[in-house]
Amino acid sequence: MSEKDFVQVAKLGKTVGLKGYVKLHNLSDFSSQFKKDATFFIKNTKEMLKIKHYNANNSTVLFENYEDIEKAKELTNLILFQSIEKSRQTCKLKKDEFFYFDILECEVFEEDKRLGKVVDILETGASYLFEIQSDEKWVEKKYPKIFFIPYLDKFVKNIDIEKRQIFCTQDAFLILENS
């Protein structure tokens, strides 16, 4: 598997107590994936970490083979990854919910006009913004290279993950024009 087959799920913080627990900073929307016996990859290594105990109340985690403070200090600031395949298995979506990695690289359309493709998703508190890299034909016409569409019903009509397409209302092109 290549790096693109994995998704960031957490960052490990400082040690907590003397028994090897470390602070877990969840970077996903799915805290349910952090449970006993769950395994994660460490960035840029083939090493896997297996959870021995997870305390959801204070977001601390204890990994097998890191059951003392000195050993656990080696984990500070590491990023944990999970395969996209395993994420699909362990993280259940509700109707009209999508994984970030499924939205990224989707083409964005307003009616028959291709506006661009999603290159990032930003959290703004109450909602999300899709960062769109404008289609070359709009850039050649001096429109901005990047613009943002709020992930709200007013702007996003339909998302078709199978076809990798997002269909927007008439207001999306207005955003591009006025960016």
Curated annotation (Swiss-Prot):
Domain spans labelled PRC barrel: 95-174
Question: Which InterPro entries would you find in this protein's record?
Answer: PRC-brl_dom, PRC_barrel-like_sf, RimM, RimM_N, RimM_N_sf, Transl_B-barrel_sf
Q: Name one GO molecular function term.
A: ribosome binding
Where in or outside the cell it occurs: the entry states:
Cytoplasm
- Which Gene Ontology CC terms are recorded? cytoplasm; ribosome
Q: Which UniProt keywords apply?
A: Chaperone, Cytoplasm, Ribosome biogenesis, rRNA processing
Judging by the UniProt lineage, the source's domain of life is Bacteria
- Gene3D superfamilies, per the entry: PRC-barrel domain, RimM
Q: Name one GO biological process term.
A: ribosomal small subunit biogenesis
Pfam hit, one: RimM
Record PANTHER family: RIBOSOME MATURATION FACTOR RIMM (PTHR33692:SF1)
Mind telling me which NCBIfam families this protein's record contains?
16S_RimM (TIGR02273)
Q: How does it assemble?
A: Binds ribosomal protein uS19.
The domain comment in this protein's record states: The PRC barrel domain binds ribosomal protein uS19.
Q: Which family does the record assign?
A: Belongs to the RimM family.
**Name of the protein this chain belongs to:** Ribosome maturation factor RimM
Q: Which organism is it from?
A: Campylobacter jejuni subsp. jejuni serotype O:2 (strain ATCC 700819 / NCTC 11168)
